[in-house]
Amino acid sequence: MKILHISNFVQKQNGRLYWNHCFKINNGSIRNGHNLCIFSDRDQSRMNILNKFNDNKILNKNLLSTFINFDPDLVIIGHADKIHNKTLREFKTIKKNLKIIEWNVDNYYLDNTEEKFKKRSDVIDAFFITNAHKNLITCLSENNSISFFPNIFDQSIENMKIFENNNFKYDIFFALSYGVGTGKIRSKKSDYDRETYLEYIHKKLPNIKTNFFGYNNIEPIWGSFFEKSLSQSPISLNLSRKPNIKYYSSDRISQYLGNGSCIFVDINSQLNDLFE
């Protein structure tokens, strides 16, 4: 199968986000024998300054040319908000039997996820999202579906076996990101609930050796530095932005569990259902 994957492949981040879901989907597609073509919407948008002033008209024109040249059987979209529905409709006009699916790893109540799904509902054949909130059904049209999929693990990326270590510098690890865009602590924060939890641990469990990032003026950590720090503790905190909803977790859960760290997760996520 020929697959066109449209997502943010974060070229401007210089490799610090190499564990993102978009890369794991690429890897899985190739391992399963498919011919893959990628299109990075945000990077393509930055390549021509005129996209700032014409609602990404040039970007969408380039995408249409890519579609025509590659002639895919399946189009996969992930967090590609700069792509117009009009462009996706043109895909289906050109190729009647084409299927378009969209994946999303955001909390239903955050980052305009509900609005984004509803906006795409008449052009997407199937949605896949890493939570199971009951209101997701309201985002559908008569001709598509929505399914839960867990955060993706990739053995070529999450390849540490922390559980085999015997000596650790710290007892517990946590990395607060404040979003992947800048990779820096924000002056206007929206994560006080998680910071409060970390402060509670420091006050109530002073003998615990913590290794926390993105907190208490310690900058977030990324790339191979993240992996090295993760490996220095046997346990990790998997704290996601609230509100807690069914089966949702930050995609950091893949890096924690996949690398062999024992994690603590909020019971209100109901993730324990998946292990019973």
Task: Please report, for each region that a protein language model flagged, where it lies by residue.
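Catalytic alpha-helical scaffold of carbohydrate-active enzymes acting on polysaccharides/glycoconjugates
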Residues: 23, 60, 89-90
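Nucleotide-sugar donor-binding catalytic core of glycosyltransferases
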Residues: 2-51, 70, 78-86, 115-276
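Glycosyltransferases and closely related glycan-assembly transferases
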Residues: 64-71, 85-100, 142
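A short, histidine- and acid-enriched strand-loop-helix "catalytic/donor-clamping" loop
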Residues: 98-113
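N-terminal/domain-start segments enriched in small and hydrophobic, helix-friendly residues
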Residues: 60-80
